[in-house]
Amino acid sequence: MSFFRIAKTFEVEYGHRLSKHPEKCRFPHGHSLRIEVVARGRELNDQDMVCDYKALKMIVADVVDRLDHAMALNSSDPQLEGLAAIGDRVLLFDDCDPTTEVLARWIFEQVAERLAAGRIVKTTTGANYEIPAGLELERIRVWETSTSWGEYVGLE
C-alpha cells in the first residue's frame, strides 16, 4: 500500500510526577518535550500536498497549549491534593502515571478527535485550510529527553 507521510514537530515545557516509580522520577520534575505528529494520506490535494503544515499546526495547537507548563499527575496519586493546588495547569490521567507512553496515547486521542471534528480550519486572518478527508493520524512520538522517546501508533 502506497501513501504519502508528513510530520510536524512541536516543543513544549511540561512537568509530571510518576507516583509508581521507585527512584527520582517519583518527585515532581519537568521536561522540554518534543512532540512529533505523523499523518498520512494516499492522495495529494490541489496544492500537491497531503495536508498543509499550517492546518496540521492549527489542529495540534490546542493540545500543545494544554500541556504548556502543565503538571501531569495520576488521578490516584497519594500526593494529588497538595499538587493539585497548582490549579488549571494540572492535567490528570485516570489511574495511570503520565509516562511518555501514556502521554503519547493521550496526545494521539486528542489530535485524532480534532482531525475528525472539522475539515476546514480558519486562521486569525480569515484564511481557510482544508483537512483532507483521507488524512489519517499515524502516530505520535514524544521525546522526553534528547535520547529517550515513546510513541503511540494508531494505524497498522
Regions found by a protein language model. Name each.
Residues 1-156:
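Charge-rich, low-complexity N-terminal segments
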